[in-house]
């Protein structure tokens, strides 16, 4: 059985917003990852879990994350069916609501320099290449003059 999980990547000005997962995280504790992730609880839908994970932002249609990819993640501890969503933030006001004390914006170059070094979560390590070749590429192409 693969337990469903929701993860939400946040992109702002062509950069990924990442935070520390915390020392008590079951998978990849004390590593860098997206600010929003959650297990899908019994009898909850994936979409409702996305909204709940986003807190107050989950009520706003203009910042609702979009589904990107579903994949299986397995290690010695877990079997997860990961549902990766992405949220492209265009407003500083919204970004201020997302910001956490331990978070920062990362460029693709900064991320590439730290991949494989244990800085990022196992999930993120698997997802970054896909993000880079889809959403980040499109974001940078569309916002080249922004």
Q: Where do the model's predicted regions map?
A:
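Active-site segment of metal-dependent pyrophosphate-handling enzymes
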Residues: 23-24, 45-47, 51, 55-93
């Amino acid at each position: 059985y693969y337990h469903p999980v929701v993860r939400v990547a946040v992109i702002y000005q062509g950069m990924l917003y990442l935070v520390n997962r915390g020392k008590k995280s079951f998978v990849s504790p004390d590593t860098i990852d997206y600010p929003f992730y959650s297990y899908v609880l019994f009898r909850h839908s994936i979409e409702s879990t996305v909204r709940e994970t986003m807190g107050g932002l989950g009520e706003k249609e203009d910042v609702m994350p979009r589904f990107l990819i579903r994949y299986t993640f397995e290690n010695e501890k877990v079997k997860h069916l990961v549902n990766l969503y992405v949220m492209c933030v265009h407003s500083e006001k919204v970004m201020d609501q997302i910001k956490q004390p331990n978070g920062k914006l990362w460029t693709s170059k900064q991320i590439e320099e730290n991949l494989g070094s244990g800085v990022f979560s196992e999930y993120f390590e698997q997802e970054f290449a896909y993000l880079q070749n889809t959403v980040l590429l499109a974001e940078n192409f569309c916002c080249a003059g922004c």
